[in-house]
């Protein structure tokens, strides 16, 4: 048995695909398998298995001249709210329609069951995304989209005055299961969490030990009994997904959480409040400190 403290870490992995792999491997506690070229194979695997929620931890933005897409295309994008964030700067020359979405949203928009983008500009979006994620966004090498002035990534960010709806931040958080039950209620955020279904805490990877968040209200002897019962269940042939049923809410869990600055501001508004539960309030205060270090305008004192 091991007692651990709450912990928050800002995940800043700039190379495309790296953050997706890291978040996905947290679910299985397989970060030890990360290598220089492991992310492509890992991401292909999660797409093939249908577990595309992990793709939500990276986000890409386009600046599209307002005359490029038809009204039908804009309506199709808005239909996917809140998966895409859309803003416009009609007072500038040129005027841009800014649209950002996580990689899962772009993948499902451009390769989903419905044909949502109706003309050749879809190829332009695919080509940009293909440069960063060739193993996700396939393109027709024989087609060369017309240059219609669409900007992508940092080039798009550089012409946008307000990135609060477009720029995302990712945190790796260690907290109790009580905490994770609360944070996942913030539905605009994206989550990848340590899976008690797949993690076998009786194994060597976990030092034959279950982590708990220390609580003065919980008797340590009770936790020892619970840990022993878990290990006994595994020894008797139970799968981790069965043995986990007896684990308490103070069991520690690692969760990776991603959201735009606007998403985090809404979270902080509710969770740094004195009336918020103590654990999530303290974690929210740490997140707020990290965001301030990035010079983000969070609008809170």
PLM ranges: what are they?
Residues 1-301:
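Family-specific signature for flavin-dependent thymidylate synthase
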């Amino acid at each position: 048995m091991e007692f651990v403290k709450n912990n928050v870490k800002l995940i800043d992995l700039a190379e495309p695909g790296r953050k997706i792999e890291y978040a996905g491997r947290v679910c299985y506690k397989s970060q030890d398998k990360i290598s220089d070229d492991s992310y492509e194979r890992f991401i292909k695997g999660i797409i093939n298995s249908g577990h595309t929620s992990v793709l939500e931890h990276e986000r890409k933005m386009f600046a599209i001249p307002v005359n490029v897409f038809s009204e039908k295309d804009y309506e199709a994008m808005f239909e996917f709210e809140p998966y895409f964030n859309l803003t416009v700067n009609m007072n500038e020359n040129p005027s841009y329609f800014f649209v950002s979405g996580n990689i899962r949203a772009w993948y499902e928009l451009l390769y989903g069951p419905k044909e949502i983008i109706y003309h050749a500009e879809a190829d332009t979006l695919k080509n940009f995304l293909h440069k960063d994620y060739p193993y996700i966004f396939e393109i027709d090498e024989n087609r060369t989209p017309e240059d219609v002035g669409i900007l992508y990534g940092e080039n798009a960010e550089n012409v946008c005055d307000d990135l609060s709806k477009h720029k995302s931040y990712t945190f790796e958080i260690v907290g109790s299961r009580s905490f994770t039950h609360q944070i996942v209620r913030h539905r605009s955020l994206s989550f990848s969490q340590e899976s008690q279904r797949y993690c076998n805490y009786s194994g060597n990877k976990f030092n034959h030990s279950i982590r708990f968040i220390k609580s003065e209200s919980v008797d340590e002897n009770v936790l020892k009994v619970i840990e022993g019962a878990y290990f006994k269940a595994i020894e008797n042939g139970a799968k981790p997904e069965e043995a986990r049923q007896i684990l308490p809410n103070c069991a520690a869990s690692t969760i990776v959480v991603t959201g735009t600055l606007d998403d985090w501001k809404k979270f902080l508004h509710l969770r740094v409040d004195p009336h918020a539960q103590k654990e999530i309030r303290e974690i929210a205060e740490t997140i707020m400190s990290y965001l301030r270090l990035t010079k983000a305008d969070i609008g809170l004192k």
